[in-house]
């Protein structure tokens, strides 16, 4: 399953602050894709965030709605008032955090967590508990926290690679150990070392049943798992076909527009170059069968394949575009190819047409 956190983790991207209307617009698009959970935000952050969450909660969405909360009763009160079904309570339990950030003992921290979970449960909320910085927290501290969570009937527990530097094999081992406690497991993987997707996959292999993701991989610092990538991995490698792959490009563009954060052209799945072919050998093969250079055809993602024209072009590239103009002339293919190869500039469609007209006159 997928928990999309574009509206919570994604809003922790520098420069990103959604209006209530933008928050709703993104939530509706995520629901159309079919994500299982939408983390709608942290309602205690500001009035604007709270209003946006309430607006989403007023809709009849299929996704489960979860709001973020510190292990504080006043935070949980905001979640209760926001009318969502789930609360995500987090607290860091590493010795370093307990000593330097919170100045409390492990027993005191567990007592605080216990009160927060019990309060949420008493108010009818389902609870996901995250021992923040799970991957760097001492096992004895984790073990005691997870056993407490199980005793309090927490609904899900999240294994968080908060600083994004964990090796995938180590992450797999940790997730398996947590799964053995019998509580359904989420994984929340940051991308600081470029390992978020790999760790998410290893989390799945270790028994996790929910992966946290964001549109365009938004989030603190280097972000977290990209929604389009993990949904496609589930489709391609695990046969999970319940998500709308044909809507991924659309929501990526929408979130880029709202946030003002553009993607690299070579970004997987939703980048502008993801289904663009340039080298003549590649183009020749793709025109025969896209599977030669596309693991899944562009059409699966509601996208169009692009053939790029510059000096790397071959005859098939030129022939392809000439046929679009109704021209079937092998000698002219050679003439135009020679012209293209002599240029250091790419040939846009308009420039291609202009050159055809010039050479034909």
Curated annotation (Swiss-Prot):
Pathway stated in the Swiss-Prot or TrEMBL entry: Amino-acid biosynthesis; L-lysine biosynthesis via AAA pathway; L-alpha-aminoadipate from 2-oxoglutarate: step 1/5
Entry keyword annotation includes Manganese: yes
UniProt GO MF annotations: homocitrate synthase activity; metal ion binding
Amino-acid positions noted as binding Mg(2+) in the UniProt annotation, renumbered to this chain: 9, 188, 190
InterPro entries: AIPM/Hcit_synth_CS, Aldolase_TIM, Homocitrate_synth, LeuA/HCS_post-cat, PYR_CT
Reactions accelerated catalytically: acetyl-CoA + 2-oxoglutarate + H2O = (2R)-homocitrate + CoA + H(+)
An individual GO BP term: lysine biosynthetic process via aminoadipic acid
Catalytic activity, EC: 2.3.3.14
Active site (record annotation): 282
Residues annotated for 2-oxoglutarate binding in this entry: 8, 68, 128, 162
Keyword Transferase among record annotations: yes
NCBIfam families cross-referenced by the UniProt entry: LysS_fung_arch
HAMAP family in UniProt: Homocitr_synth_fung_arch
Full protein name: Homocitrate synthase
């Amino acid at each position: 399953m997928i928990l999309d956190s574009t509206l919570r983790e994604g809003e922790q991207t520098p420069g990103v602050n959604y209006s209530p209307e933008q928050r709703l617009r993104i939530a509706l698009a995520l629901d159309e894709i079919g994500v299982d959970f939408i983390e709608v935000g942290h309602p205690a952050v500001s009035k604007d965030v709270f209003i946006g969450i309430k607006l989403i909660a007023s809709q009849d969405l299929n996704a489960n709605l979860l709001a973020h909360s510190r292990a504080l009763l006043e935070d949980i009160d905001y979640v209760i008032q926001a009318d969502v079904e789930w609360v995500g309570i987090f607290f860091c339990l590493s010795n370093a955090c307990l000593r330097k950030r919170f100045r409390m003992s492990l027993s005191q921290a567990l007592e605080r967590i216990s009160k927060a979970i019990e309060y949420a449960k008493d108010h009818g909320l389902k609870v996901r508990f995250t021992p923040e910085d799970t991957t760097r927290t001492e096992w004895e501290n984790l073990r005691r926290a997870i056993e407490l969570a199980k005793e309090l009937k927490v609904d899900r527990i999240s294994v968080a690679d908060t600083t994004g530097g964990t090796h995938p094999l180590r992450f797999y081992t940790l997730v398996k150990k947590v799964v053995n406690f019998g509580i359904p497991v989420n994984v929340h993987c940051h991308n600081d070392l470029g390992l978020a997707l790999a760790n998410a996959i290893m989390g799945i292999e270790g028994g996790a049943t929910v992966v946290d993701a964001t549109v365009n991989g938004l989030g603190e610092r280097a972000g977290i798992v990209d929604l389009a990538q993990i949904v496609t991995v589930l489709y391609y490698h695990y046969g999970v076909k319940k998500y709308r792959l044909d809507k991924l490009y659309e929501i990526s563009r929408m979130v880029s527009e709202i946030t003002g954060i553009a993607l690299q052209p070579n970004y997987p799945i939703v980048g502008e170059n993801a289904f663009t072919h340039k080298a003549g050998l590649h183009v020749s093969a793709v025109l025969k069968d896209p599977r030669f250079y596309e693991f899944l055809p562009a059409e699966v993602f509601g996208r169009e394949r692009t053939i790029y024209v510059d000096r790397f072009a071959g005859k098939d590239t030129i022939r392809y575009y000439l046929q679009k103009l109704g021209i079937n002339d092998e000698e002219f293919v050679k003439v135009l190819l020679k012209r293209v190869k002599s240029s250091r500039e790419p040939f846009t469609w308009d420039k291609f047409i202009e050159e055809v007209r010039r050479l034909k006159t």
